[in-house]
């Protein structure tokens, strides 16, 4: 993986391929490359390690022409083999060029087979296996490129997508979609394909989303699609509302900072049209969901990464407000063990991108079980998760470019809180909690704005952390998962090893890590757990730990040489998880900047993880 672009046109397409790659960089990358069939029907390929601008400079310095009307391009995030030019895509076998996302699980067996046919491998990738296999099948058994790709697809096992180009058939691309997303962009005398519609927004506003098992034949004037049963089929065309403007930083130096400061607006957009006169109502959940909601006795949430941390917060809420038992599953574990799903369960799938392979596998897996209903909560309107779910709740945070989740995390929590209120409303239970959520959630954007004002206080702490190798973050109640999310942000954006713990668990092993060189961040709010958290602070102080407290202004702490206190504005207890993550996001950002980390594109990470 990570990003595919392909174009068939009547005009030269080099600049559009490069633009597409630039729009895919946010998904994660370590190298990039492109191949075009030039105006003499010769296959021209170039690959480089690093950012797309490294590839652009190399193309400018090359004497050979990369002008052509058919081409493919790719940004790579390494899964098989290190980031090298040989491992970058496209991969070439004679007249065949292939770009690929996903993993071919039986590539070692196929590699051995191809070596016996005297094929030589220049890379460590599973993608080169596909290129050689298509070349071998084409030469051995003949047929159109479409027929050859169909036959080869039956030899491959895994979740993947590919786009194939043949210099002997210069006006056609063949795409296959087996669990990893591909989107066709429709143009005039030009058609395109990509793994993300952002790559094609400068070419089209009209898209076809391929379904699992689809194989598509793309020319500059026609699209033909076959489904997994090899039936020729028409797929719906969708007109997107996404604008290229979202891909701009505005007055901010980094997308990460921009997205942190966009959170009040993102939350307002998530609340829009969902606040009625005196209650919260999610129109997406009308009809069958509202009729069956009375049968729900259990909640199961499935998520990865930051979405898993937001699910952890919501567990407290589901049990406290809706009186429903709740458990949380890591998607990558959920699919590979014997699972038990109660027939009176509501299943909730959380994803920022809606393309995370583990989440999609989990969603597809549960369809064979007996349960009441499933819902997805997602930020990407036209994603695979949205299209495959029974019902979806969109968070409307706007496109998030930085790899580290910020506004999608807080809007996801907002959506979960609204869902809980909606369930209480339909079931006619806990009117007080409904009122509390209704009143609090409307002032959440304002509370986030106030929390952003602590940026200067947070910035003063940066040098105390930037040279540290380890950081411990603790919290109680809903602040425990926020401590975990804060630790994840530090890992991602500053490369500091950080761990979030439940404060009460310190004495069960973590106290052994406390020393004068390990900062301990303590998240404190004024609630019934305050006294216990204060006791934990004393435990750390007595062992010489360096303590950094983030707490509401009204809480008093005795002065101590090894304690630093950052005072936070008042926030309602219900809104503490969404509000308290903000200073942690800011701290992670400023430490990353101090350490000269590429905070928008941290090393080794991808925004959209399309492999399991």
Swiss-Prot record:
Keyword list, A-Z: Aminotransferase, Cytoplasm, Glutamine amidotransferase, Repeat, Transferase
Domain SIS: 289-429, 461-602
Subcellular location: Cytoplasm
Any one GO biological process: UDP-N-acetylglucosamine metabolic process
Gene Ontology terms: cellular component: cytosol
Active site: 2, 607
InterPro entries per UniProt: GATase_2_dom, GFAT, GFAT_N, GlmS/AgaS_SIS, GlmS/FrlB_SIS, Ntn_hydrolases_N, SIS_dom, SIS_dom_sf
An example molecular function term from Gene Ontology annotations: carbohydrate derivative binding
Subunit-level organization: Homodimer.
Protein's name in the database: Glutamine--fructose-6-phosphate aminotransferase [isomerizing]
Species of the source: Wigglesworthia glossinidia brevipalpis
